[in-house]
Amino acid sequence: MKIMISGHRNFKLSGYDKEWIQEQIEEAIVFYPGRAVCSKDKYIGVCGAADGVDLWYLELLHSHLLDYHIYIPFEEQDLYMTKKDAERRKYFIGEARITKKARNREMVEDCNEAIVVWDGTKGGTFNCFQQLKKKKKNIYWINPLTKVI
């Protein structure tokens, strides 16, 4: 099962309870609705490796020894990150089971379900959320504004 993540970048996460968000992402990985627990042979993470939510997801997948695919939207993405985040991103790209150049549309097509960290505002995560709904993909929505799942 391929589970993608879409969520806000660091600049949009300021003011939100980041620890709570990370806990909810981990909860979604380990106890995703409809499954008892994740297992290495059945769970593949999918993300774009942006700063913020994407890197948190990759860290959690890595710590649970789960495979992941990275869909890189553009090569210069790391130029918009802190040096530390760019280094972490580079490490995760090197560890990915599959890495390819692709946009949100391809991630939505390739995933079975999605975890979305979204506060309800317009932007890239909103666009991805709309695509997931249109494709009738199951969505585990983590709202950092209201702290509602």
Regions of interest found by a model, annotated:
Residues K2-I149:
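Acidic/glycine-enriched connector segments
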